[in-house]
């Protein structure tokens, strides 16, 4: 926002001292092999609200913005409240299954109450995908809901001509070769096994394929065509440059994710002109438009289906180049922070009384 000449007063982090009162609760639930989210307790939500209210009183504030619904749940500051996030609690609870199975029934009920209360309290709630917005629409007036996709977190210095040139170069020098890139930290949920099997099938079909894996450690024996690179942090210049080099050198981004609320990594793939091949699940379809900047396969689709779609791209230079160009266009038009933040600023401005 500051980059777009908006005055921003930051209150972060919020004090969490009140959480110490709930140490016995954490201990008991852990002993029962369950968990509880302390941020959903009203007393903690009220403590957050008091901090924000005091901050607002001492400054000239037009709009309160939060990237989470939690701090604004019980906020009463007399100002418009805007939030921007990637999902609502009840959708995540239903969608992610195992990840929420350890929560107590009371904890789940509090989570749903917190989200619904926050949505009633805010002026506008923006979400990173249509899937997330649909979940929120079950809790509040849909007129206050907006879709704003998340952008790429990697710097982009190239232009459309560079993308066209690189795509043509890749297909002219790698006629029966394919460099796949997989980026994800949860091997099972991100579909690592499907990615490995896809690469195996492509090799069996006569397409010399290498799969580079970032983030996750593959389960089981690592085949010779798989290169496991471990976790690479974007927080360091060295790590950021390594990721840039990997995206730039890859042909296709593959992520057979079983559950995904949003897709920053798909925005990053598009920013380098990489077609993505993934499942049409959760918020993914807002980042990978089937037939535009990649292919979205129906959930449960086999590795053979992934291999088939990738083989089509590899064996048709014109089709690959078209995907690559459209991917970069999607990044320039939608999947970048500048565009989404500019829309967010307009949304915030519209909430301010004249």
In which residue ranges do the predicted regions lie?
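Acceptor-binding helix/loop patch of EC 2.4 sugar-transfer enzymes
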Residues: 32, 78, 82-116
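A short, well-ordered alpha-helix in the C-terminal region of glycosyltransferases
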Residues: 312, 319-334, 343
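Donor nucleotide-sugar binding/catalytic pocket of nucleotide-sugar-dependent glycosyltransferases
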Residues: 104-108, 113-167
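Conserved donor-binding/catalytic core segment of Leloir-type glycosyltransferases
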Residues: 126, 164-190, 196-201, 211
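Aromatic "clamp/platform" in nucleotide-sugar-dependent glycosyltransferases that forms part
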Residues: 258
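Nucleotide-activated donor-binding/catalytic signature segment of Leloir-type glycosyltransferases, i.e.
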Residues: 215-252
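Short hydrophobic beta-strand element within catalytic cores of glycosyltransferases
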Residues: 275-278, 288
